[in-house]
């Protein structure tokens, strides 16, 4: 029986690091961000709809979508942002479910759905258990400012654009505290996998 684990966190909480740890354990990780990029490539249904909805002005000379230009349009206009989400999100969901179900059919013990905005998108129903990668707010802020070269206000705006980590923590089945060393984080992950290996769905 396959246990489907939802993996989420906040910006700069270290979720990608934990996703890599799952992969190092030989566990399939279905990455929503990677799929979102694939979903808008030429020849995909979402690509066609974006070109029709937003016009050829959002296409590069190669025919690929100009992500920067599209980003500028949707961040400046809430209605356009919702339009884009309505095109892309259903396709991403479909592709994620397909990859999840392939892992289940293959009889894998675990499969991880790595979804940054899992709760915000209401996708927890696709999983059996949810892990939130958590760090204290001060550390999240410090890491984000350093990683993205942002000032404090810019970093805070990005953090507040998502549901707070403490809120996600309350809703999760398990929390990995990523404020210590990588070794600490890895130990928590292995402990969880050991515990969940013994449960039936």
From Swiss-Prot:
Write the Enzyme Commission number(s) for this entry: 2.7.1.24
Binding positions for ATP per the UniProt entry = 12-17
Q: Does the keyword DNA damage apply?
A: no
What Gene3D superfamilies does the annotation carry?
A: P-loop containing nucleotide triphosphate hydrolases
**Record-level Gene Ontology MF annotations:** ATP binding; dephospho-CoA kinase activity
Give the EC class as a word. Answer: transferase
Its ancestry begins with: Bacteria, Bacillati, Bacillota, Bacilli, Bacillales
Where does the record place the DPCK domain? 4-201
The protein depicted here goes by the name Dephospho-CoA kinase
Tell me which InterPro entries the record gives: Depp_CoAkinase (IPR001977), P-loop_NTPase (IPR027417)
Q: Which UniProt keywords apply?
A: ATP-binding, Coenzyme A biosynthesis, Cytoplasm, Kinase, Nucleotide-binding, Transferase
Q: Which reaction does this enzyme catalyse, per its entry?
A: 3'-dephospho-CoA + ATP = ADP + CoA + H(+)
Which Pfam family is one of this chain's hits?
CoaE
Provide the species name: Bacillus licheniformis (strain ATCC 14580 / DSM 13 / JCM 2505 / CCUG 7422 / NBRC 12200 / NCIMB 9375 / NCTC 10341 / NRRL NRS-1264 / Gibson 46)
Q: What does this protein do?
A: Catalyzes the phosphorylation of the 3'-hydroxyl group of dephosphocoenzyme A to form coenzyme A.
């Amino acid at each position: 029986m396959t246990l489907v684990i939802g993996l989420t966190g906040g910006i700069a909480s270290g979720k990608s690091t934990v996703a890599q740890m799952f992969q190092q354990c030989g566990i399939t990780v279905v990455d929503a961000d990677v799929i979102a990029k694939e979903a808008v490539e030429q020849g995909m249904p979402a690509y066609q709809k974006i070109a029709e909805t937003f016009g050829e002005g959002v296409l590069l000379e190669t025919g690929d979508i100009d992500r920067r230009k599209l980003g500028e349009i949707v961040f400046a206009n809430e209605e356009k942002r919702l339009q884009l989400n309505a095109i892309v999100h259903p396709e991403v969901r479909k592709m994620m479910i397909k990859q999840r179900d392939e892992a289940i059919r293959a009889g894998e013990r675990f499969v991880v759905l790595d979804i940054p905005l899992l709760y915000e998108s209401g996708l927890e129903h696709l999983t059996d258990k949810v892990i939130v990668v958590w760090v204290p707010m001060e550390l999240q802020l410090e890491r984000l400012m350093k990683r993205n070269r942002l000032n404090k206000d810019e970093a805070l705006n990005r953090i507040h654009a998502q549901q707070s980590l403490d809120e996600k923590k309350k809703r999760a089945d398990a929390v990995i505290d990523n404020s210590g060393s990588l070794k600490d984080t890895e130990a928590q992950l292995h402990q969880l996998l050991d515990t969940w290996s013994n449960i039936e769905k």
